[in-house]
Regions:
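Active-site beta-strand->loop->alpha-helix modules in alpha/beta enzyme cores, enriched
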Residues: 2-177, 211-214, 227, 240
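A short acidic, Gly/Pro-enriched loop at the edge of an enzyme's catalytic core
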Residues: 358-366
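A short SAM/SAH-binding and catalytic strip from SAM-dependent methyltransferases
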Residues: 365-378
Length: 457
């Protein structure tokens, strides 16, 4: 991933942020997804100081509420000063371990600090280890997990966010993601505001956060007067974390939009009754270049109408959605179509927040239909990366989206396809464009035409 910033960038000003939707956000809900009030706060930090910058006020609030706090630190930040003439990585790691213990004590007197000791700058290769370390700490009712935003723009932060999203699958833990470096580079369109919440901090909580940040001396001040020992957190950056509130991205709020939609209307988009939708589904299925696929993935299945049409073409298909109501309706749709559900049947319905969460295994078919608009540009990039990481050598990707403006969302179909197509970098086998809809089929290099694959040529 190309870096969007350096730590010396001034970035977006606080004045600009003050004019953004940031100021009108709803309050954070400090409970698990079942509504049990906060009892255990688990804070994931990619590096020592992330916990203070992104969730220091939340940690102080947990102390006030009598909740336990566990800080899981993925790396010890030994690569923060790669050109330091005075502090080799081993010394920095030791110093930063001491700093985070002192900082955590400022925020919560009984905070437990767990150092995983994974390599700084290479966390993406160790996401499973982070997920495993978190998962064993998320079982208690009333657990909230705070973690770096998975689209923060720093490779370690993004990896930590993905690991956290994987860890909460199958638990009641609420995931609150905190931006850090995004405050430098992001514009309003880069932030998924529908999921954003704020935690207003009282003066004592702000003081505790300031004291904790001061403990990270290797980051807020120079290591020495020598070149290469300069401070990492410059005053302009620190100002983002001196606000009277902290900002989190709550996946449950974003999912709640679709949950309310599906709970209120049996078929929110008229999939069953509208000729436009029935014709588009027929085009979608007809565009698939093979008669049968081993294992398919449908990103955002809604009530399962397309799922039921795709299932006969797949030995198994994983269909995902963020909404439990949508998945319940999808189960009924699939059953009515005479297609069985996993584990005995071929349709595996899963509640996942893609692309932050992602199903295991390999797929030779991935269908992204009418969901790309709901992601930011960075989210589309991550979706493409996830697809490429799980697409078989003979894999096929189908994209299908409405081309007219999407009220309330930044993107419509054409820019969604342009972004995904560019990031995937796969040959386009089919491109069907109408005034209303764009449908494209992309394949791995070497996948032949239908005629070639079926022996006509």
């Amino acid at each position: 991933m190309t870096a969007r910033f350096t730590h010396t960038d001034e970035g977006r000003s606080e004045e600009s942020w003050a004019a953004s939707p940031l100021t009108g956000l709803p309050g954070a809900e400090l409970s698990d997804r079942d509504g049990v009030p906060l009892r255990h706060l688990v804070v994931l930090a990619a590096h020592p100081d992330d916990e203070t910058l992104g969730a220091g006020g939340l940690m102080a609030r947990a102390a006030t509420l009598g909740a336990a706090v566990t800080v899981v630190v993925a790396t010890q930040g030994e690569a923060s000063h790669p050109s330091s003439p005075t502090h080799p990585p081993e010394r920095l790691a030791a110093l930063r371990a001491d700093e985070i213990r002192a900082a955590a004590a400022c925020l919560h007197p009984r905070a437990e600090v767990i150092l995983l000791g994974l390599p700084d700058g290479r966390l993406a290769a160790h996401e499973d280890a982070v997920t495993a370390a978190l998962r064993v700490r998320l079982d208690e009712p009333g657990t909230v997990l705070a973690a770096p935003w998975h689209l923060d723009g720093h490779t370690d932060h993004d990896a930590a966010g993905r690991a956290a999203a994987a860890a909460v699958i199958g638990t009641a833990a609420r995931l609150l993601e905190y931006p850090v470096w995004a405050w430098l580079w992001a514009e309003d369109a880069d932030i998924p505001w529908d999921g954003a919440v704020r935690l207003d901090l009282d003066p004592a909580e702000r003081d505790a956060k300031a004291a904790a940040l001061a403990e990270h001396t290797t980051q807020v001040g120079p290591l020495s007067p020598e070149p290469g020992d300069e401070a990492i957190l410059l005053p302009g950056m620190v100002a983002r974390f001196e606000r009277s509130f902290e900002t989190f991205l709550d996946a449950e709020r974003f999912a709640g939009i679709f949950e309310r939609l599906h709970a209120g209307v049996a078929d929110p988009w008229g999939f069953r009754d509208r000729w436009y939708e029935r014709r588009k589904r027929a085009l979608t299925v007809a565009a698939l270049p093979r008669e049968r696929f081993r294992r398919g993935l449908e990103v955002g299945c809604s009530i399962g109408v397309l799922t039921a049409d795709l299932a006969p073409r797949c030995e198994t298909i994983v269909a995902t959605d963020v909404s439990p109501a949508a998945l319940a309706a999808a189960a009924q749709t699939v059953a009515a179509a005479g297609v069985g559900l996993a584990p005995q049947g071929r349709v595996d319905l899963r509640r996942l927040r893609l692309p932050a969460q992602w199903p295991e295994g390999e797929f030779d078919l991935v269908v992204v239909s009418e969901v790309g608009y709901y992601l930011t540009a960075a989210g589309l990039d991550l979706l493409a990366d996830r697809i490429l990481g799980s697409l078989s050598e003979d894999g096929v990707v189908l994209l299908c989206h409405w081309r007219h403006p999407m009220t309330g969302w930044a993107l419509d179909g054409d820019p969604v396809h342009e972004r995904l197509r560019g990031r995937l970098g796969l040959p386009v086998a089919v491109r069907h464009v109408e005034e209303d809809v764009v449908l494209e089929v992309l394949t791995r290099p070497g996948v032949g035409s239908v005629a070639r694959e079926t022996g006509l040529l």
